[in-house]
UniProtKB/Swiss-Prot annotation:
This is FK506-binding protein 3. Residues 184-194 have a biased composition (Basic residues). PANTHER family: FK506-BINDING PROTEIN 3, PEPTIDYLPROLYL ISOMERASE. Inhibited by both FK506 and rapamycin. The lineage of its organism: Eukaryota, Amoebozoa, Evosea, Eumycetozoa, Dictyostelia. Belongs to the FKBP-type PPIase family. Keywords: Isomerase, Membrane, Rotamase, Signal, Transmembrane, Transmembrane helix. The chain crosses the membrane at residues 148-168.
């Protein structure tokens, strides 16, 4: 019974910790949802945008203008930029202007960047999409190759199954282990009568 309560407590703790999702907030957009007239960005698309990166107080820490006014280019999903920027550009429209807030967990983390981004700092971006190029079509057999995440998930599942089997063998259910075999009734010694 105690093991059951401990397991239940651990599961409840995990459920609460996973329910507190961290996400990117869209603060402002000039394109209402569902009214995109051009291309919409998705994972695998090559996106080109102009940006201004700011802290909460409005201080600019980076922008396209600082880099000569050139647009910034990346492929969504390649993990070459901070995760929050990739998440914040999913479903953005070509030509759209969008302001987003990225929590520090999806930006520069606990430590920040020395002399540039303070530790545990949420950041804000004003984005303007210049262009979106769709991802090139992949051959069908490429789509069958599992990702690293899928392989890790299946490995963890296999490990969990092995662990459960080990626990079941190591700690059998005691209520079932003392039952007599079916068939002949068990003989008991009768008390001697004089």
């Amino acid at each position: 019974m105690n093991k059951f309560l401990i397991a239940l407590l651990v599961l409840a703790t995990l459920a609460v910790s996973f329910s507190q999702e961290i996400g990117v907030s869209i603060l402002k957009t000039d394109t209402p949802k569902g009214e995109c007239k051009g291309k919409t960005a998705s994972i695998g698309d090559y996106i080109s945008l102009k940006y201004v990166g700011k802290f909460e107080d409005g201080t600019v820490f980076d922008s396209s203008e600082i880099h000569g006014g050139f647009s910034f280019n990346f492929t969504i999903g390649e993990r070459k930029v901070i995760p929050g920027l990739e998440i914040g550009t999913i479903n953005i429209c070509e030509g759209e202007k969008r302001s987003i807030k990225i929590p520090y967990q999806l930006a520069y983390g606990e430590n920040g960047i020395e002399n540039a981004i303070p530790p545990r700092t949420d950041i804000y971006f004003d984005l303007e999409v210049v262009s979106i190029e769709g991802a090139p079509a992949q051959p069908f057999y490429y789509q069958l190759i599992p990702s690293v995440g899928t392989i890790i998930a299946f490995s963890m599942l296999a490990g969990f199954i092995v662990l459960v089997k080990f626990i079941i063998k190591r700690y059998p259910d005691e209520s079932n282990s003392k039952k007599p075999a079916p068939g002949k009734p068990k003989k008991t010694k009768a008390a001697k009568q004089n």
